Every structure is written in structure tokens, then in C-alpha cells.
A protein has these predicted regions:
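Residues in soluble alpha-helical coiled-coils and helical-bundle/repeat scaffolds
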Residues: 4-7, 108
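Membrane-interface loops
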Residues: 6-90, 102, 133-146
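Short, aromatic-rich membrane-interface segments at the entry and exit
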Residues: 14, 89-94, 112-116
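Interfacial helix-loop-helix junctions of multi-pass membrane proteins
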Residues: 41-45, 63-68, 100-128
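Solvent-exposed, well-ordered amphipathic alpha-helical segments
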Residues: 84, 91-94, 110, 128-130
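Hydrophobic alpha-helical segments of polytopic membrane proteins
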Residues: 92, 117, 121-141
Length: 146
């Protein structure tokens, strides 16, 4: 996001911000109206290596409640879409990093496949809505400077 602010077009930055803010607001509204949770995590994480310790620490601070749609995936896919409009060299790096983030949320049992699909669908729907706003001229009132 900071890359878009510093080096990208201002309209791309504001478009990504609009999608991020609207998406997180919609997701939080879903959590209030229909709380969700997962029981995917193991009862105990065995091992004394650094990775087992990190997973235990993650499980201690991040509960498996309010998971659908996934805000992790929503934000990641929104930024991947935003970087798609940017510089050409940034696209592969953003895609690889984005896929790694999405896979890590599932492999660490923070989200299920349904959470991931709904988070990505929300990101694409908000991008389509932002495109519609852009075509209608509503986005022209966006400030060009911060």
C-alpha cells in the first residue's frame, strides 16, 4: 500500500484504499451479524523447534473466531489487484507473496477454504464496484494530493 502511495498513481492508491476500507467494514459487519468460528486446530502442537514455538505463539494470540470472510485474504487479493495496475516488475512479486500469504492462512489453520473463497470473492466484487464508480465519474472527486 505504501508503494502505491509513494510510486503509483494517486487514483490507484485511493481505489485500493476504498476497497480495503469497504471490505473490512463489510467483513466486520458479517462478524457482528453472524459470528463464525473454526475447530481445525490441533489440541496440542508437538515439538520444541522454533517453528512449533511460533505456531503455539500464533495460536495463543489469534483466536479462531470471526473467520468468514477472511480479512487476510480480502486485503491480500485487493492489494494483488491494485499492483496488477502498477509497474510490470511488481506484478510477479505481488502475486507470489499474495499466494504465499493466502496459503499460510490455510496451512496454519487460521481459515478454511470457504473463508478464503468468500474473502477473495468479496475483494473481486469490491473491485468491480470501484470500476463501476470510476466509469460513472464518481471517483474524479478523489483528491490528487494527500
Amino acid at each position: 500500500l505504501f508503494y502505491l502511495l509513494r510510486h503509483g498513481e494517486r487514483s490507484d492508491f485511493w481505489r485500493v484504499c476504498l476497497c480495503l476500507f469497504a471490505g473490512m467494514t463489510i467483513a466486520l459487519s458479517c462478524y457482528v451479524l453472524l459470528p463464525t468460528g473454526l475447530a481445525l486446530r490441533p489440541y496440542r502442537v508437538y515439538g520444541s523447534d522454533i517453528f512449533a514455538r511460533l505456531v503455539r505463539m500464533l495460536y495463543a494470540v489469534d483466536s479462531s473466531k470471526n473467520v468468514c470472510p477472511s480479512i487476510h485474504v480480502l486485503n491480500t487479493v485487493t492489494l494483488m489487484i491494485g499492483y496488477r495496475r502498477g509497474r510490470r516488475w511488481m506484478r510477479p512479486a505481488a502475486n507470489v507473496l499474495g499466494v504465499a500469504i493466502i496459503l499460510s492462512t490455510m496451512l496454519l489453520k487460521q481459515h478454511s477454504c470457504i473463508d478464503v473463497v468468500l474473502g477473495a470473492a468479496l475483494a473481486f466484487a469490491l473491485d468491480a464496484a470501484a470500476s463501476s464508480l470510476e466509469r460513472s465519474g464518481e471517483m474524479r472527486r478523489v483528491p490528487q494530493r494527500l
